[in-house]
Amino acid sequence: MSSEPLQDLRNRLPVLAQTAYLNAGTCGPLAWATADALADGTSRAAVVGRGPAYFEVLVSAHARLRAAYAEALGAEPADVALTTSTTDGLGRVLASLRLQPGDEVVTSTDEHPGLLGPLAALRNLSGVTIRAVPLADVADAVGPATRAVACSHVSWVNGERAPEAALREVGRDIPVIYDGAQGAGAIAVDPASLGCAAYTGAGQKWLCGPVGLGMLWVSRDWADTLRPFALSYGNLAEPARGLDAEPWPDARRFDASAISAEMASAGATATELLADIGWDQVFARSAGLADLLEQTLREGGYEVAPRDRTPLLSVVTPDPPAMRARLADAGVVVRDLPGRPYIRVSTGVWNSEQDLQRLLDVLTA
């Protein structure tokens, strides 16, 4: 990415004026246009009201957001549900499996609480067994009692990728559910080629939208198995039929029930800003910056957690919370991982080599 387009992008993201923002793995930087879309939509609703015209805007905004998320994933809009978070999507699809006592779900030992929470609820409510193994071993851990695999596509701890080829084979027989919080908008996904039953993602991380948005891709091959547990007005093809109303045959049957027009518009605006750059360039530059940082750190004698080619990198430090605070004081935003010896760095297409140097200056001081 040449300097002029990069600077133009950075000018649209006000936090970058003073801050080396390296934390899209938590929340990406908000663009002025995203903030304006949220504010303008809310103001318009306040002034004009939320009558029939508002709901026409809402339907249009949902369609726009669905299309934007689908493009980011490399999917068809009809296969993408709109959710409020990665966890929201995970909860919806796990509940749809209708598992029974004695059934087993395989996951990994380094999962985010956003997946562990729904899995724990599933265990406590349904009596299923949750079996956790290292991410690299999840496919090999599948046994006779396994009814699903639910794991990260990209680990939130170190940027490791799941064993995609092996899980593709597993997915021929049982549903594979990916937590794509660190995948959607960070790397090329193409969920259909992954052979998974469902792929969840977040709108506020690598897609730089407001907190409160996410997506759930659902495979058409698993439509008969993944039946939504809770339905609301927007999930029904003909709501006027009351108890006889059927859900939409496409992914809309999994939509969250209350995503406002202004939120959807803001999320679409954020995602389209990245799409205008070109997703191939977004993915290549984001991972390339992490690769450059890893090389520099290793040459300087620092220990970097094993990772794959993703925009996430975790470096070992003696006191991660203290280092995170030192970096914050210097205008460098990263995060530490509770209970782990790392600070985690997330590099996005919007970052510059100077952002990395500011990080290195504090680490080596």
What is the predicted function of each stretch?
Residues 1-365:
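Pyridoxal 5′-phosphate
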